[in-house]
Regions:
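Thiamine diphosphate
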Residues: 1-160
Length: 160
């Protein structure tokens, strides 16, 4: 949801010290990170996923001591890959969380662009189920990536 991007000045309270920063570009991207702390994992997400991931990242840091740097592109095309590159060079681990089926997505494009730059990294891409979005609430919950799935994946990814 594009309205989520306007709340960058009022993020949730973070006991871990996470803050939003804007990139220095005309149409800026957001970076959610802790100042003076090297991240363990780079997470990329956008839209309606951002607020949920903000809460989840704080939990990962407070409960598991995993520091995540979240990059939130605001303009998907043309994509400004530079903030992602800068983060990946530090972490070597990319976790993409997207509300889309797994084939031909922005997450796939991000991975392809990074590989074309010959950057060495490991990547995990979490997507919705590869099916039609159901109208039933119960089936819809099985369709989308859950916060618990993202949490568990990030925790396992950190240990690799």
């Amino acid at each position: 949801n594009k309205l989520d991007y306007t709340r960058k000045d009022s993020p949730i309270h973070s006991n871990s010290g996470y803050k939003y920063k804007k990139t220095n570009t005309k149409i800026y991207d957001l970076k959610y990170s802790i100042d003076n702390q090297e991240p363990d994992i780079t997470m990329v997400c956008w839209g309606g996923m951002v607020c949920d991931m903000e809460l989840l990242i704080n939990d990962l840091t407070e409960k598991e001591e995993i520091v995540v740097e979240m990059i939130c592109p605001t303009m998907l095309y043309p994509l400004n890959i530079q903030p992602i590159v800068e983060s990946i060079l530090k972490t070597k681990k990319l976790l993409i969380v997207e509300d889309d089926n797994p084939f031909g997505t922005l997450g796939s494009e991000i991975i392809a662009q990074l590989k074309c730059l010959n950057i060495e990294f490991n990547a995990i891409k979490l997507n919705t189920a590869d099916d039609i979005i159901p109208s039933s609430r119960i089936l819809e919950e099985k369709h989308y990536v859950t916060n618990q799935e993202v949490y568990n994946t990030a925790k396992e990814f950190f240990l690799k």
